[in-house]
Amino acid sequence: STHCISSAASDVYKRQEVDASVVPSDAQIQSELAHVNYRNIQINGNDVMLTDSKAKLDLGGIAKGFIADKMKAYLQSKKISSGIINLGGNVLTVGEKSDGSDYTVGIQKPFDESGEPICTVKVKDKSVVTSGIYERYYRVDGKLYHHILDTTTGYPVKNNLYSVTIISDSSCDGDALSTTCFALGIDKAKELINSLSGVEAIFVTNDYSIITTSDEYNVSTE
């Protein structure tokens, strides 16, 4: 499941981003990890309460997707039938291009400062959301610490992935699924994606291989 709740387990890393020469101690991480539990959220109508005073609710993982979906709904309410919303990592297309063709959306090559895409996809009226370890990270003694954390350990997720891209109808869903699939790893992520209707994934591994769950969107490296 996707946990929106976080404690200072993630805040510890965020604070350390100011001083990239320091890694939180294991004792710090384990202490804060005790407060990571989505069951601490109580919802009553429009009221949301946390039963753990040391827990924090972090919606950063879905905020851009939520905003993108609202922007698309607004444009459609104004009878705009063609357009593209780009919030950086979240691309949401409205209908198809004015000439009737699909949009070409690039997926960034991890750690490439030039911004060149590693591949492109062809979509219309779809969301394309990417989560990757190259977005926010720092290195200490040659070791990379990224922002996607394993909620069972408190440390950055360890696997062979650099990024996960989700193609779906909803950008908010894409936000949640891209992070979740990254944490799950390729095999379990594929199982999840295959269980969902209208959702596909593109995985970029740490040797820059591209793995897809479908050929539907004409993934191209040219």
Language-model region placement:
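Single conserved hydrophobic/aromatic residue that forms the stacking wall/gate
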Residues: 1-9, 13
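Secondary-structure boundary elements
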Residues: 11-49
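Second-shell loop/turn segments in exported
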Residues: 14-20, 55-62, 163-167, 177-179
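Cysteine-centered nucleophilic/redox motifs
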Residues: 52, 61-92, 185
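Solvent-exposed coil/turn segments that connect beta secondary-structure elements
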Residues: 108-112, 126, 133, 153, ...
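Low-complexity, Gly/Ser/Thr/Pro-rich intrinsically disordered linker/tail segments
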Residues: 195, 204-222
